[in-house]
């Protein structure tokens, strides 16, 4: 993404100097011919009246950074009304976003042709309903786009995405390629094999490693889908905001918290070596975890409910010990550390594990659909 909020100026300069593929360490022999797509990071300017970048800036950026594919600068429309309201029935601000996305797409593809840009242009589709998105897609085809990037999907329910894709496929040419932008329903990909989708992007396997309340660790399910496990939360006592606030307010003792933190870590690592039972490990983990819950809420009934729920989820993780069944590079190298929700490094590693599991899941899904 060309969103300016993501990298420092120094990093941006290095990316433009070395090219995006090398910058992202995606330049190995196995990846040299793979797709490298750029977009405008439209979430970063969602509250602005217009996109943060002009078509000229975007074409220049994609060219300099060496992308193989580039999406026209769009402006996100979040709502998707299945009753298909007409143009004069939608809010002026929504219609303005639709029009600027279409106008940018025209200017963008004109510039790609004029400059003989070395990437394939992808036309961004935005709309307030399945019908308006289908009309936008046909408009992009008429401009000359052969690859469409479908936006605004992130907040939509799976059933609504189906309706959108049905409307799109009905309206556009069968050979027109489709990319799903920010497909947050990545675990439902098996439902979408019938729409001729060429590609999609999703951060959910990575993000869920450290942002989801319960599904932090992906695992192949014997039934063919995906299973999810809760990572075991043992934060650093003196770096966790909730715990530090509790210490400052005199509710917790720093020494006591650090002692419980170490006890939980030792128990979990001993469990991994077969030296401690799942039950005693669970007790040590929950003995520390209760302070996190107490630091978040003073509602005793809610605390009890949250602790019981977490105890069930952590108990399942310990019972199944999924990291022992996984032979990916991450789990083979770090073992039980991958399941500990603690520092940035561990959480990132778990994210990479999830990506590997998810990649395999997509491959299997595609093979089964043939």
Task: Report the location of each language-model feature.
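Non-catalytic, usually N-terminal nucleic-acid engagement modules in DNA/RNA processing proteins
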Residues: 1-113, 269-312, 366-370
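Short, solvent-exposed loop/turn segments at secondary-structure junctions
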Residues: 4-5, 42-44, 75-78, 128-130, ...
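Short, low-complexity, polar/charged sequence segments that are solvent-exposed and flexible
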Residues: 16-18, 55-59, 89-91, 140-145, ...
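A generic structural signal for short, solvent-exposed coil/turn residues
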Residues: 28-30, 115, 172, 320
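Residue-level preference for short coil/turn positions at secondary-structure junctions
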Residues: 32-33, 66, 117, 144, ...
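Residues in well-ordered beta-strands of folded domains
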Residues: 71, 124, 329
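Glycine-rich phosphate/ribose-binding loops and adjacent secondary-structure elements
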Residues: 115-285
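C-terminal accessory extensions appended to soluble enzyme cores
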Residues: 214-370
């Amino acid at each position: 993404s060309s969103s300016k909020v993501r990298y420092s100026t120094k990093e941006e300069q290095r990316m433009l100097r070395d090219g995006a593929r090398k910058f992202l360490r995606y330049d190995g022999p196995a990846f040299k011919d793979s797709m490298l797509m750029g977009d405008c990071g439209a979430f970063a300017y969602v509250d602005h009246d217009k996109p943060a970048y002009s078509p000229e800036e975007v074409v220049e950026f994609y060219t300099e950074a060496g992308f193989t594919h580039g999406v026209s600068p769009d402006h996100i429309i979040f709502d998707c009304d299945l009753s298909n309201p007409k143009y004069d029935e939608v809010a002026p601000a929504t219609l303005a976003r639709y029009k600027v996305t279409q106008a940018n797409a025209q200017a963008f593809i004109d510039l790609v042709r004029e400059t003989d840009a070395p990437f394939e242009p992808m036309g961004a589709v935005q709309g307030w309903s399945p019908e308006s998105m289908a009309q936008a897609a046909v408009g992009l085809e008429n401009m000359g786009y052969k690859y469409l990037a479908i936006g605004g999907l992130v907040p939509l329910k799976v059933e609504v995405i189906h309706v959108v894709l049905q409307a799109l496929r009905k309206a556009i040419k069968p050979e027109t390629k489709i990319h799903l932008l920010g497909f947050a329903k990545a675990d439902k990909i098996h439902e979408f094999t019938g729409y001729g989708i060429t590609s999609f992007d999703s951060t959910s396997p990575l993000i869920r490693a450290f942002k989801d309340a319960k599904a932090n660790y992906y695992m192949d399910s014997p039934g063919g889908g995906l299973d999810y496990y809760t990572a075991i939360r043992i934060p650093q006592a003196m770096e966790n905001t909730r715990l530090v606030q509790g210490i400052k307010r005199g509710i917790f003792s720093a020494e006591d918290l650090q002692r419980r933190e170490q006890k939980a870590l030792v128990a979990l690592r001993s469990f991994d070596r077969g030296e401690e039972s799942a039950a005693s490990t669970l007790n040590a983990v929950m003995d520390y975890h209760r302070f996190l819950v107490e630091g978040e809420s003073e509602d005793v009934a809610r605390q009890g409910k949250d602790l019981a729920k977490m105890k069930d989820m952590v108990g399942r993780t310990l019972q199944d010990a999924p990291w022992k069944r996984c032979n990916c590079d991450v789990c083979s190298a770090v073992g039980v550390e991958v399941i500990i929700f603690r520092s940035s490094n561990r959480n990132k590693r778990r994210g990479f594990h999830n990506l590997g599991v998810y990649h395999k899941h997509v491959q299997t899904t595609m093979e089964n659909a043939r």
